[in-house]
Amino acid sequence: MTKTEQTPEKLKEGIKIPAEKLTTIQLISPTVELLVGGPYKALDGMHTYGHMALRVMTSKEERIYDFGRYGKTGGDFSAEGEGILRVWTDFNSYISGENSYGRTTKGFSYNITTEQAEKVFAHYSSIIAGATKRRSKHPNSEEYKLAQDYHGISNNCATMSLSGARVALPGIDANSSAYNVGNGMGNLEKVAARGTNFGAWPSKIFMPADVQAMLETEKKYVPKKVEVYGKGLK
């Protein structure tokens, strides 16, 4: 076969693909994914509280906002403490850590616009602005001690994730009161939850399992995809 050489002018025209050849160009559309982690079993017993994080993706960048009790803790059931926000730039790094607990994480993905994604990034940037950066314990992540402490009811992984989700998906938790029942909590924990609110049940949804029930039922926003990560309890 004769070798054909192309001049610079020909190269500038680009590569022509024959009509019978098929090619696939994959474009990443802006997406927000609510990640809800389930219970898991550890050496010290069952951990039923669950976890939640928010993943935001565009064609240019990806962030997973992961808030939790990653610092000093205290209070009843260790439900209070330093508010630590981890910001991951690689999903596999984040989810491999969650999978290592033996839990299942369910991801609810929604299409958004680039502008909406940028607003979510800006939302968390404003939270981080007043934070103290800490040395990260994990690759592909940065860690911040926020000005506001962690609280198991009023400022936890679920409330932090929903605060960003609402920026892109206004009203996603508008009917959350119907699902705010404390799934994953023991009876003593529920009594303590009422105690922190002067005997009344907290008004805002705060348990990851309750958020999952809401996302699985409500139709204001229908996820483009629901994906399960990890093998769950054995």
Regions found by a protein language model. Name each.
Residues 176-188:
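Aromatic sugar-binding interfaces of carbohydrate-active proteins
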